[in-house]
Amino acid sequence: MDKIIKSISKNGHFRAFALDSTLTVREAQERHQTWPTSTVALGRTLIAAQILGANEKGDTKITVKVLGDGAMGPIIAVADSKGHVKGYVKNRELDYKKASTGEVLVAPFVGNGFLVVVKDMGLKQPYSGQVDLITGEIGEDLAWYFLSSEQTPSSVGVNVLLNEDSDTVKIAGGFMLQALPDATDEEITEIEHNIKSMPSIATMLTRDEPLKTMLDNIYGDMEYKNLGEFPLAFKCDCSKERFLEGIKSLGRQPIEEMIAEDHGAEIICQFCENKYEYSEEELKALIN
């Protein structure tokens, strides 16, 4: 089971999340049938959305949009505070790796553009923040968002490692570390050093207690408190009824055309690839 551990330093100067999102990203890859570069980019965006969702409470929904001008096209992920996330990438069929190392290349195919974060708290107007993509690697871009839009110095790491023989998802996860208002410059320097010198996310996620290992490495000698473990999962809230309401909102003429030309309708959810079919009778009931 995927999960996130939330923590805070005992002096209250830092907080950190550590996530294992392997099953989440694996399910996204299987549902969307993405190729390696697209899998890694979508996976990183899903993990980023899970990090942002874990920051929230109640019924708040977070939408993360990576809007670059590269061949990848838009990457969209939607998460809630309960650990659920869904998402898609426009171009699923990108497969580029460094010839020397086999490393999957992401940034060149994301390109230049924007990271947009939309918070929907159920109020009249959702909150929206936007920053330039500074690397296109997504983790660094999310850290830049926290600093620019929320004035919170942060370090974010997100990683998706694929199996070399099959390009399926081997491991996926990440972390977020934030300096809180009372953090001193010396403490921030110490934490930065810890993060720069710790093993890769993929390496830590293969350890016996992966998320504890990640937090131990982030905090180093600083004592911290575990605030709890929470489950994570790929979960879409689409339904046949919800899409039927969408069809109804189109109005009489488009529905009559569906009946006359196709004798029904088929809708595939963009976020999860679930397919919904509507009979001629179901469509007629919408306009009678």
Curated annotation (Swiss-Prot):
| Top-level taxon in the UniProt lineage | Bacteria
Its main subcellular localisation, reduced to a broad class, is: cytoplasm
Keyword Nucleotide-binding in record:
no
- Subcellular compartments: Cytoplasm
Task: State the organism named in the record.
Answer: Lactococcus lactis subsp. cremoris (strain MG1363)
CDD domains for the chain: Hsp33
What GO terms are given for molecular function? protein folding chaperone; unfolded protein binding
Q: Which N-terminal residues, if any, form the signal peptide? A: none
Q: Give the CC-aspect GO terms.
A: cytoplasm
**Record PTM:** Under oxidizing conditions two disulfide bonds are formed involving the reactive cysteines. Under reducing conditions zinc is bound to the reactive cysteines and the protein is inactive.
Q: What does this protein's UniProt record list under function?
A: Redox regulated molecular chaperone. Protects both thermally unfolding and oxidatively damaged proteins from irreversible aggregation. Plays an important role in the bacterial defense system toward oxidative stress.
**Gene3D superfamilies, sorted:** Hsp33 domain, HSP33 redox switch-like
- Disulfide bridges in this chain: 236-238, 269-272
Query: What's the protein name?
Result: 33 kDa chaperonin
An example Pfam family from this entry, by short name, is HSP33
Q: Which family does it belong to?
A: Belongs to the HSP33 family.
Q: Provide one Gene Ontology biological process annotation.
A: protein refolding
Q: Which UniProt keywords apply?
A: Chaperone, Cytoplasm, Disulfide bond, Redox-active center, Stress response, Zinc
The keyword Zinc is assigned to this record = yes
